[in-house]
Amino acid sequence: MASRFPRFSQGLSQDPTTRRIWFGIATAHDFESHDNITEERLYQKIFASHFGQLAIIFLWTSGNLFHVAWQGNFEAWIQDPLHVRPIAHAIWDPHFGQPAIEAFTRGGASGPVNIAYPGVYQWWYTIGLRTNQDLYTGALSLLILSAIFLIAGWLHLQPKWKPSVSWFKNAESRLNHHLSGLFGVSSLAWTGHLVHVAIPESRGEHVRWDNLLTALPHPQGLGPFFAGQWSVYAQNADSSSHLFGTSQGAGTAILTFLGGFHPQTQSLWLTDIAHHHLAIAVVFIIAGHMYRTNFGIGHSMKEILEAHTPPGGRLGRGHKGLYDTINNSLHFQLGLALASLGVITSLVAQHMYSLPAYAFIAQDFTTQAALYTHHQYIAGFIMTGAFAHGAIFLIRDYNPEQNEGNVLARMLEHKEAIISHLSWASLFLGFHTLGLYVHNDVMLAFGTPEKQILIEPVSAQWIQSAHGKALYGFDVLLSSANSPAFNAGQSIWLPGWLDTINNNSNSLFLTIGPGDFLVHHAIALGLHTTTLILVKGALDARGSKLMPDKKEFGYSFPCDGPGRGGTCDISAWDAFYSAVFWMLNTIGWVTLYWHWKHITLWQGNVAQFNESSTYLMGWLRDYLWLNPSQLINGYNPFGMNSLSVWAWMFLFGHLVWAIGFMFLISWRGYWQELIETLAWAHERTPLANLVRWKDKPVALSIVQARLVGLAHFSVGYIFTYAAFLIASTSGKFG
């Protein structure tokens, strides 16, 4: 008999259809639970899937390059980056009537097109690409790379090429290679590209394969390098009147420390960026020689961890036992990787707008808003995933004997203190912040705005002043002309930095006031509550006073039946599920705040944010009600415009979001009754009753319905906000 889906679990494949399909999909990637899995096969499958993942990423980026080269307007955009709208790709839609064709034909195109808001035009322009031919070459190269990775993935599943478990668990070698090779050498290679291709291109010199070996990136070549006169490479930098992409005002320096932004492009100096990558390369290549491998020199990670016993014995046995615990748990390693990647992704969001690296991207407001929002949402999902896998580690991989008395065991031992402190912080933040907003709201409603409680964020303003922002008059560190710090940096990066930080037209160290103070604490409430739910879910995943044997039930279970009342809703999966709602709402506040503050900055009316953000009706009326006007105007009595697609997506996003509640609020019994009624009708309907089922149709389980509800809530939430963000920004700024 041909085995049915899922082939990896004979038990599941014999189950009734609903359970078989749902649990089959849910456990498809849970290799640990598959039939006949061994530790060796587990590691090899994950290793091979990494090659597939990389192949997909390169295929996707290749597609971006290819479609822009084929249907975009890259060469036209380069001539006037501030006024030509960059095209992502053409739209072919047989339903388009004449009004739609006219509305979507823009950016100098001959037919309907999509405008690009991911910043790839600015990125490609900055790194030295100039023609469609360059884009096609890049697309083809990435396609070939993608194929190589697919072949490598297949190859490493063949008996002769399968790595052993000991190879996967060789942490020191992996660290050395990832630090030196992945980060170090790739940063060095990127420095090379910037110095040999991007910087000459920004000065009007065209360097390609045909002249790469003959075009000197610096007039003195490698002479100063070997003579130890490295400062020569920083001399004669581009002037402040330099026109990007031309020789006008260009210098010859390749590695500088100018600080601040290029006046015309409003982005970091390319020569500063090259210097930064060279420094990263040096640091990481050295770091990749730290750990002991076959050569018997360097640090042993295990020895470092075992030796690290805290002074005074206040922290028990410190890190003893951690090396083997982490090295033998894929979930622990994944949790650490996701936590790091989540933080990095959020930092990318914060830095892409405040310190823009790509030429002219700072003046493309819709792209700035889209990139910030995109990276914050991605960060939220990745961070919640870190806690999910942390909980799975505690359930599946944690061994109490191995970790006796170490920092991990002590986390579990005093979990009540951790959870209650987080709870207290969340309650404090929530009540005080809401109290201030509501008080201010009532004062405005009663016509006495002067009775608002407005708190200046003095600590944050002091920190901004220490970095050189003069506006607040704090006269401290870099904002004080007498400080040693001020004098020390005067000859290198400081003048450029101070000009930039005190220039009110960019997003670096934005001026903050009482509205920022309030929303900052609202966001802090969201962050602490999300963390509380996730930390509690992980720390209670093995067991709690209510359910001491919880780990026997696994990561996700609905309840343990009526015999133990009150065991519903307490699996680690339920904590993850609850936390995602808080995560989404928190990032909602973050992105609303960012967007409103920037809209007023870009329009030159910062007073609107400053005055309206201190009370609830201000947020509702002057941001959430005022800005969707473009969305509800996508179709009007005069026909349609180019925002109509966002208007439709805005409505569709609300629909998907609302469908989520259908699954979240009505539970299993309702659906089971409904299904049985539908089945009854089906069996009595001519023609329809020719189609029969082998097993009884059943409703989704509680956990399955929650997953479907959560998926619709998340997707609808993001679709709605994406449409709102892009339409309200592009509608204002063209």
Curated annotation (Swiss-Prot):
Swiss-Prot/TrEMBL catalytic activity: reduced [plastocyanin] + hnu + oxidized [2Fe-2S]-[ferredoxin] = oxidized [plastocyanin] + reduced [2Fe-2S]-[ferredoxin]
The protein's name: Photosystem I P700 chlorophyll a apoprotein A2
UniProt: chlorophyll a B1 binding residues: H654
HAMAP family xrefs: PSI_PsaB
Protein encoded by which gene: psaB
Molecular function terms from GO: 4 iron, 4 sulfur cluster binding; chlorophyll binding; electron transfer activity; magnesium ion binding; oxidoreductase activity
Localization terms from the record: Plastid, Chloroplast thylakoid membrane
Parts of the chain that traverse the membrane: 46-69, 135-158, 175-199, 273-291, 330-353, 369-395, 417-439, 517-535, 575-596, 643-665, 707-727
Amino-acid positions noted as binding [4Fe-4S] cluster in the UniProt annotation, renumbered to this chain: C559, C568
Gene3D superfamilies referenced in this protein's UniProt entry, alphabetically: Photosystem I PsaA/PsaB (1.20.1130.10)
InterPro entries with a match to the protein in the record: PSI_PsaA/B, PSI_PsaA/B_CS, PSI_PsaA/B_sf, PSI_PsaB
EC number(s) from the headed UniProt entry: 1.97.1.12
Alphabetical UniProt keywords: 4Fe-4S, Chlorophyll, Chloroplast, Chromophore, Electron transport, Iron, Iron-sulfur, Magnesium, Membrane, Metal-binding, Oxidoreductase, Photosynthesis, Photosystem I, Plastid, Thylakoid, Transmembrane, Transmembrane helix, Transport
BP term (GO), one: photosynthesis
Keyword Nucleotidyltransferase among UniProt keywords: no
Annotated cofactor note: P700 is a chlorophyll a/chlorophyll a' dimer, A0 is one or more chlorophyll a, A1 is one or both phylloquinones and FX is a shared 4Fe-4S iron-sulfur center.
Protein family according to the UniProt entry: Belongs to the PsaA/PsaB family.
Function description: PsaA and PsaB bind P700, the primary electron donor of photosystem I (PSI), as well as the electron acceptors A0, A1 and FX. PSI is a plastocyanin-ferredoxin oxidoreductase, converting photonic excitation into a charge separation, which transfers an electron from the donor P700 chlorophyll pair to the spectroscopically characterized acceptors A0, A1, FX, FA and FB in turn. Oxidized P700 is reduced on the lumenal side of the thylakoid membrane by plastocyanin.
